[in-house]
Regions:
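A glycine/threonine-rich phosphate-anchoring loop and its flanking beta-alpha core
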Residues: 18, 130-223
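Glycine-rich beta-strand-to-loop/alpha-helix junction loops that act as flexible
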Residues: 86-88, 119-121, 264-265
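ATP/NTP phosphate-donor binding region
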Residues: 1-114
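A short, small-residue-rich loop immediately preceding and capping a beta-strand
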Residues: 108-131, 135-146
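C-terminal charged capping/lid subdomain of soluble metabolic enzymes
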Residues: 2-3, 10-12, 200-203, 302-389
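Active-site segments that bind and position negatively charged phosphate/pyrophosphate groups
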Residues: 216, 220-333
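Generic secondary-structure signature for well-ordered alpha-helical cores
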Residues: 70, 106, 176-179, 185-192, ...
Length: 389
């Protein structure tokens, strides 16, 4: 007779997200506390990886890491010189980078109690985090995001992934970090386009979850577009808190179901990135994706026109795009190329298509199909808006 043994268990995860300034100041003991937050009272082994673009923009960073380790030799030791890892689209699209990180860590004989300290933008954190999650089924990962986008979103979450097979995040793992340290001093070398692009993720969580935060973004938009430090830090902290709240209380942190509220605007945004050969940055792609879904929701009768106008106005006020020519690219059969993003998104979700659309600022609904004629009309409206501005 067939038999079955049913099993059920729960695993609790917890990790802190710190906000600080100049974490590598030798007078600061924050990182020492991060490495020893379990109270193990020993010298921890740490392998540091640095985004190559960040290292080039901040020539003294690696020396600061070494000096900090020297000053706190009683708390941790660097197992190697900080190793530069390519950032941006290269990190997300080259499996060899993952292999290189794995080889470096393997040669150091890092164990499951050892630390990987990843300092960089979201793509570099994704690549390094993926590699760290594979070694011994998971080393302790401490992320130090160096972009607005990563400090708002990618750097504080529980996912790692790289692009492959023509799809965003085709290969990846769910692996919560040991800790996250959001150091605002790392943002000072960001080019304006990257700084502004990261604010798309703040707009995203405001639209789907928090009308009060959305209103603050509207008020602060001129200062945020200008890169003023205090409003920027406030927006990052608020966006990260909302993002983390969704992970912790949304009921599906590892995405076993089909709903993806934190992917508002991403089905089109990801496709635009692919269509542009990654010339379109993630933040800019998501901004246009949110604009498209906002107009679509309005035309579908889900979102009041006044709310749609506010969303589009905020995206524009922050200096983010609401239209890109790639929206109008077509396949040989005449189908819009961007529509293929719906199929990619469905495959990534698994099972039933589930796209988050706003029904009011701070509220959403899930839809299970998209009308291509409405998508075409929404793109036309965004093109007209783009010409007017």
């Amino acid at each position: 007779m067939p038999t079955v043994i049913h099993n059920r268990f729960a695993v609790s995860f917890d990790y802190p997200v710190h906000f600080t300034d100049n974490a590598f100041d030798p007078a600061s003991d924050l990182l020492c506390g991060v490495f020893d937050r379990l109270g193990e009272k020993r010298v921890h082994r740490v392998a540091a990886f640095v985004d190559a673009g960040l290292a080039e923009a901040r020539p003294g960073l690696e020396a600061s890491i070494r000096a900090y380790a020297h000053a706190h030799a009683d708390a941790f030791e660097l197992t190697m010189e900080p190793l530069r890892i390519p950032g941006g689209c290269k990190a997300k699209n080259d499996v060899a980078i993952i292999q290189n990180i794995v080889f470096a860590l393997g040669n150091l004989h890092m164990d499951r109690q050892s630390f990987v300290l990843a300092i960089g933008g979201g793509s570099m954190l994704d690549a390094t985090g993926l590699a760290a999650s594979l070694i011994h089924r998971g080393l302790r990962l401490v992320r130090m995001p160096s972009t607005v986008l990563a400090q708002c979103d990618a750097g504080v979450g529980v996912k790692n992934g790289i692009d492959h097979h023509g799809q965003k995040n085709f290969m990846g793992t769910f692996a919560p970090p040991f800790a996250v340290v959001n150091d605002v001093s790392l943002l000072t070398s960001l080019p304006p386009r990257e700084r502004v692009g990261g604010l798309a993720e703040a707009v995203k969580v405001a639209v789907i979850r928090d009308g009060a935060f959305f209103a603050r973004l509207e008020t602060d938009a001129p200062a945020l577009a200008a890169g003023e430090p205090a409003p920027l830090r406030r927006a990052i902290e608020d966006a990260a808190a909302i993002h983390l709240r969704q992970i912790c209380t949304g009921g599906d942190p590892f995405e076993f179901g089909s709903a993806r509220p934190l992917d508002f605007g991403h089905w089109a945004g990801h496709r635009l990135e692919i269509l542009s050969g990654h010339a379109i940055a993630h933040g800019q792609g998501v901004a246009v994706g949110m604009a498209l879904d906002t107009v679509y929701a309005k035309r579908a009768g889900l979102l009041p026109e006044a709310d749609a106008a506010r969303v589009l106005a905020l995206i524009g006020a922050l200096g983010l795009p609401r239209f890109l020519p790639e929206l109008e690219m077509r396949r040989p059969d005449g189908e819009l190329e961007v529509v293929r993003g719906i199929g990619d998104f469905r495959e990534h979700l698994g099972g039933r298509l589930c796209i988050t659309l706003p029904t009011a600022i701070g509220r959403t609904a899930e839809v299970h199909s998209m009308d291509e004629a409405l998508i075409e009309a929404a793109i036309g409206e965004l093109r007209t808006l783009n010409h007017k501005t």
